Amino acid sequence: MTKVAVFAGGQLLDFSTGFDVFVGVDRGSLFLLENHLPLDFAVGDFDSVSKDELQRIKTKAEIFIQASPEKDDTDTELALKKVFEQYPEAQVTIFGAFGGRIDHMMSNLFLPGDPDLAPFMRQITLRDKQNCIQFYPAGSCRILPEDGMTYVSFMADGDANLTIDGAKYNLDASNFFKKKIYSSNEFLDQQPITVTLESGYLI
């Protein structure tokens, strides 16, 4: 299994380096170079870097892919598609998915809404110091606790109902109430939580 790190254009205050492949998304490419990390892929329209910075990225990247600013995908979506084309079994961690433009953050939170990325949703994790975002397809999902993290929240894509079992606050037919996001729940004694979703996907 290939472990891929994608460095996007949001805040990059906390990241790890134990990966096989490093991907820079637009200005994230420059961040990798400035931190003396490999730049295996550089992907984006590169509208957030100067001409000199772009030339440096072109020179240093093993694979350089420049897209038109007028495109259907965000730079991060485009980078993920290129990664899964080459490494279809990869486990991908995205750093810098938060803390920048809010429209980019929202796009990152709903990556499985792209039909090309939906088949890979279980292979994508968004991570920073305070957050770990994962995606689960409809059905019964077993959510494992994360070291150092107490709280867990659930959001269903679309209007599907969900149930929560094994958490501090369970949700089933006896106490069901409808919300877009069920936030600030907690793991009990570091035990897994089971969430069942009728359709769509779980964030």
Q: What do the PLM-derived regions correspond to, one by one?
A:
Residues M1-R56:
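N-terminal beta-strand-loop-alpha-helix module at the start
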Residues M1-T2, D20, P88-Q91, R122:
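Short coil/turn segments at beta-strand junctions that form active-site/ligand-binding loops
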Residues V6-A8, D26, F95-A97, R127, ...:
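Short beta-strand segments
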Residues V23-V25, I65-Q66, T125-D128:
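General beta-strand structural signal in soluble alpha/beta enzymes
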Residues S29-F31, V49-K51, D73, R101, ...:
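Short gly/pro/ser/thr-enriched loop/turn and capping motifs at secondary-structure boundaries
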Residues F64-Y87:
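Short phosphate-binding loop-to-helix
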Residues Q91-G139:
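Anionic-ligand-binding alpha/beta catalytic cores of soluble enzymes and soluble regulatory domains
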Residues K129-N131, Y136-I203:
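Long, charged alpha-helical interface segments
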